[in-house]
Amino acid sequence: MKKKILIVEDHHDCREILGLLLTKIGYHVIKAQNSKDAIACAEAEEPALIFMDMELPDVDGVKTSAMLKQNPKTSHIPIVALTAWMSELWRKKASKVGIKTYLLKPVSSQTLRETIEEFTDESLIRANAV
């Protein structure tokens, strides 16, 4: 069974390219363009991992991630930040709300696959749920 990956990205082209890359390497892709859609998709689809853009139009990626981590239905899902830049301040904020790591755009399909496999390992998920 293909792992479900949720892409939260407000830029249509970035969202589509990332979706194509992930589909091509064997993942089932779910897409959201803002915070509200991200939360609804995460609750309904229960993805194995979320790639979260940090600059969303309604609520930024850090706050959206915090909402997902506070929600019992989605708190166990690993979140990886996707961003064109990451300052030390943003890195600290992201870490505080439970974002596992960040990837700088553009990102290769190999990096995507390695990140997904690293953060969707079953033993890691169980350890993080405790």
Give a label for each model feature:
Residues 16-24:
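Charged docking surfaces used in two-component/phosphorelay signaling
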Residues 19, 63, 86-101, 114, ...:
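Alpha4 helix (beta4-alpha4-beta5 surface) of REC/receiver domains from two-component response regulators
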Residues 15, 57, 75, 87, ...:
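The feature encodes the CheY-like receiver
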Residues 9:
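Conserved acidic carboxylate
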Residues 45-51, 56:
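Active-site beta3 strand of CheY-like receiver
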Residues 34, 60-63:
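Acidic catalytic/metal-coordinating carboxylates
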Residues 40, 62-75:
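Short amphipathic alpha-helix used as the core "switch/output" element in two-component signaling
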